[in-house]
Amino acid sequence: MVPWLGPDDPFPSVERALGAASGAPGLLAASADLLPSRLIDAYRRGIFPWYSDGQPVLWWSPDPRMILVPAEFRISATFRKTLKRVLREPRWEIRVDCDFAGVMRACAQAPRRGQRGTWITAEIIDAYSSLHRAGDAHSIETWLDGRRVGGLYGVSFGRMFFGESMYAHASDASKIALAALVAHLREHRVEMIDCQQNTSHLASLGGREIARKTFVAHVRRAVAEPPIPWRFDKRVVAGLLGQAASATAADAFDR
């Protein structure tokens, strides 16, 4: 039985989330509210909301957990050429927090294979916009010829980034934003991006699954660190093109 959380009820232990044999593996709790304080508490515990319009707020903590270690980000030969062009041509820009709400709306409207509608509801946009105004949620945006053509958004506490969604209106535009995020996080010694659930696209870029207990233990440590700055210079992306992945960082989490 999934517990119902009242406004003052704490989250149960993530170990109580439904298991693989259930119809909803990883489902931990449900509630009527999506208050910013609840959202902040959730992320700090390795929990995230995911639900559709008309449903209660559903809170999840799956096991295993999909992550991307910045040092393990994979760049194909073709995408390497794309990044070099982005660095070389002024018509390409990478902006941070220029249009956070616009990125969220674009992610909500992006078609997803096998998915009808969107989980990025008006309530979700309002809640994450509140986190953004507080400096806890950020957008990385790809701009071409003065037009936003792709991007992603997520939540950041300490030295931990929790990815939420991405979209592209031009070829590789979301991947460019992800590469910029990876470069920025590497620059500031962030060791893990939470990707929540496994997808073949994330796996092709270096994402992998780790045990929930390993993930939660890392989150607990990382969110206690001082926050990283969110000023960005696209030249940091050059570091991705000339540096091999760090074996030390790559081996820091159980496979």
From Swiss-Prot:
The kind of enzyme this is, by top-level EC class, is: transferase
The EC number on file is: 2.3.2.6
Q: Set out the biological process GO terms recorded for this chain's protein.
A: protein catabolic process
Q: Which InterPro entries match?
A: Acyl_CoA_acyltransferase, Leu/Phe-tRNA_Trfase, Leu/Phe-tRNA_Trfase_C, Leu/Phe-tRNA_Trfase_N
Q: Which keywords has UniProt assigned to this entry?
A: Acyltransferase, Cytoplasm, Transferase
Specify the domain of life of the species encoding this protein.
Bacteria
What is a GO molecular function of this protein? leucyl-tRNA--protein transferase activity
Is Transferase among the key words of this record?
yes
Of the GO CC terms on this record, one is:
cytoplasm
Which residue pairs form cystines in this protein? none
The reactions it catalyses are: N-terminal L-lysyl-[protein] + L-leucyl-tRNA(Leu) = N-terminal L-leucyl-L-lysyl-[protein] + tRNA(Leu) + H(+); N-terminal L-arginyl-[protein] + L-leucyl-tRNA(Leu) = N-terminal L-leucyl-L-arginyl-[protein] + tRNA(Leu) + H(+); L-phenylalanyl-tRNA(Phe) + an N-terminal L-alpha-aminoacyl-[protein] = an N-terminal L-phenylalanyl-L-alpha-aminoacyl-[protein] + tRNA(Phe)
Leader sequence range is none
Q: List where in the cell it is found.
A: Cytoplasm
Per its UniProt record, what SUPFAM superfamilies does this chain match?
Acyl-CoA N-acyltransferases (Nat)
A Pfam family cross-referenced in the UniProt record is Leu_Phe_trans
Decide whether keyword Transport is in the record.
Answer: no
Q: Report the PANTHER family cross-referenced here.
A: LEUCYL/PHENYLALANYL-TRNA--PROTEIN TRANSFERASE, LEUCYL_PHENYLALANYL-TRNA--PROTEIN TRANSFERASE
For this chain, the family text in UniProt reads:
Belongs to the L/F-transferase family.
Per its database record, what is this protein's job? Answer: Functions in the N-end rule pathway of protein degradation where it conjugates Leu, Phe and, less efficiently, Met from aminoacyl-tRNAs to the N-termini of proteins containing an N-terminal arginine or lysine.
NCBIfam families from the xrefs? aat
The protein here is known as Leucyl/phenylalanyl-tRNA--protein transferase
Q: Which organism is it from?
A: Burkholderia pseudomallei (strain K96243)
> Gene of origin?
aat
